[in-house]
Amino acid sequence: MPRPILATIHLAALSHNLARVRTAAPDAKVWAVVKANAYGHGIERVFDALRSADGFALLDLDEARRLRALDWRGPILLLEGCFEARDLELCSRLGLWHTIHCQEQIDMLAAHKTQLPHRVFLKMNTGMNRLGFTPERFRAAWIRLNALPQVDEISLMQHFPDADGPKGITAQLQAFDAVTHDLPGERTLSNSAAILRHTGALAGRSDWVRPGIVLYGSAPDFPEHSASDWELQPTMTLSSRIIGLQTLAAGDTVGYGSSFVAEGPMRIGVVACGYADGYPRHCPTGTPVLVNGVRTRMVGRVSMDMITVDLTPVPRAGMGSEVTLWGRASKGGAMLPIDEVARAAGTVGYELMCAVAPRVPVAVD
C-alpha cells in the first residue's frame, strides 16, 4: 500500500478563479500565468481548466513546448524573454511572444535572421528594479526595436511592486504613462493584486492582465484579505492520514530537540507528511491542520517524513484519520487556507504550492 499522502488538484476551482479574474477585469484579455509548472499544479493537469484564457504566460521554452504539445495554438508569452540567441529561432517555430527587458536582448534580436518577425513585449522598470528599461531609457529602446525588420509588433508592459499594499500603484502608473502615452501597442500592466485591488484605476488601461496566484486560489494581499474575501477557491489540497498514535503525560516531549512539552495528559497523532514532501520544516508548534475536518494544531518539529498533531479537539480521531495540511477536507466542507499555513511558516502560499515534492502522488478532481 502506498504512503497515504496526496496532493489533489481541483479543476473546477481553477475555472472558477479564472472567471473571477474576468469579472474583475471584464475588458481585458487574460494571460493565465503557468510558470513554475503552473505554480506546482502541473501544466498538463491545469490546461483544460484554463484553456479559455486568451493566452498563457510562462518562463522557459520547455514549458512552451509542453503547451504546444497539448495543441494550444493561441498566444504564449515568455515573461523573461530569451536567454540566448539560439532561443529566438525556437520562438519563431513555436510562435511565441517574448519580453524584451534589456539592451542585450535587443542586440540578439537585431542579429537574428528570420523569415517570421517577432511579437515582443517591451518592459519598463517602474520601480520593481528587477527587469526592464528605466523610464529614461525606455523610448530609445522602443525606437530601436521599432526599426528592426525582425519585429512585427511591440506591446508594452510593466510590473507593480506594491499593488498588494498601502503604497499602491499611482507612482508606477504615472511613470509608465509619462513615457508611453503616445506610443502604439497593447499594454499589460496588472498582476494578481492589481487586478483585484485596483479595478477602478486600471479600467480600460490594461489590454492584457496577468493573473498568477489568484488563479490558484491564494490571496495576493493576505492577511489583509483572505482568498474567500476575494471569492477565490483553493485549487490544491495536501492531505494525509494518521499512521501512529501516542498518549502523553505532563512533561513528555515530542520530536527532535524535545521542542514541545506537554502541559498535561494528551493524545497526539503521527502524520505521514514531512519536509521531504514539501511541508515547510520551519512550521512551528501551533501551525493549523485539520483532522477529520476539525481544526487543531501541529506540535513539535517537522521531520523529514512525519509531523505530529494535537488530537485534543478530535477525541475520536485514530489510525487512518484524514489530515488536511491545506485545502479542503474530504467531508463536511471544512477548509484550511494555504495562506494560513504559509503565514505560520513565515512564507507565502506561492512557495508552498511550488514546493510540493515529486514523491507526493497527485490526483485530479
Swiss-Prot record:
GO CC, one annotated term: cytosol
Pfam families attached to this UniProt entry: Ala_racemase_C (PF00842), Ala_racemase_N (PF01168)
UniProt entry tagged with the keyword Isomerase: yes
Statement: the UniProt record of this protein carries the keyword Isomerase: yes
UniProt keyword annotations, A-Z: Isomerase, Pyridoxal phosphate
Modified residues (N6-(pyridoxal phosphate)lysine): 35
Family annotation (PANTHER family): ALANINE RACEMASE (PTHR30511), ALANINE RACEMASE, CATABOLIC-RELATED (PTHR30511:SF0)
Protein name: Alanine racemase
